[in-house]
Amino acid sequence: MAEILRIENLTKEYKIKKDSIFEPTKYFKALDDVSLTVNRNEIFGLVGESGSGKSTLGKAILKLIKPTSGKIYFDGKDIETFDKRELFDYRRKVQMVFQDPYSSLNPQKKIGWSLMEILGIQKIGTKQERIKMAEKILEDVEMRPSVMEQYPNELSGGQRQRISIASALIVEPELVVIDEGVSALDVSVQAQVLNLLNELQEKYNFTCIFISHDLNVIEYLCDRIAVLHNGVLQEVFNAEELFEEGRAEYTKKLFESVKMKLR
């Protein structure tokens, strides 16, 4: 299968605040020499506890932060070498769905305005074409077009998450990074959104990196799974291999913690 994303020896360090100016500078490694590949049209899971580095990796892919060292290749090209035009295209091709959809929506603007603003920034379509595109993507995420006249605070958490997904997909990206996309939702709503994501991924043929601390969600949704712990990649395996012998010790601990919560 053709790869869309390749990460080579990625490290991200942050300075640790000093208690005294006389202390030597110390660094915390949020990512430590991480290497992996993501294949085109797959759903790739990044799982780990809080502080594992999974969200840091997502931000690096989106160019929201700059790595300390290492490379990220998109379609075979180092994203740090992009010129202005290539970066503009990359911003369309790679989209993000945040954990808190409310924070990614303008509370003072109607949903329709927010969706069409995204198209406007990307210089896609005329005003009438943008309206039709907004109506279509809302139907695809199982929302009525009339929601375009509503404000974010008039919607439920599940509805706002659907709008967040619509906002990412309206520009027809090649890669979507979803960071804890269902963790704030009720279990029943989680299931609805996960099923919707599966359907949308098949319809739009986008690659998805799904970031979560929940191994149950990751195992249900993803084709392959990468496990991170303290910034270090523990292993990468196919989802159906989760319960096989030979998993890394940290993966086993994650799995045991999930079983304890279910008891």
Predicted regions, residues:
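ABC ATPase NBD coupling module
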Residues: 21-25, 79-95, 121, 241-246
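Conserved ABC ATPase signature
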Residues: 151-155, 159
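A short, proline-enriched helix->beta-strand linker immediately N-terminal to the Walker B motif
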Residues: 170-174
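Conserved ABC transporter NBD signature motif
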Residues: 70-78
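A short, surface-exposed alpha-helical micro-motif characterized by mixed small hydrophobic
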Residues: 218-220
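Conserved ABC ATPase "signature" region
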Residues: 78, 129-146, 255-256
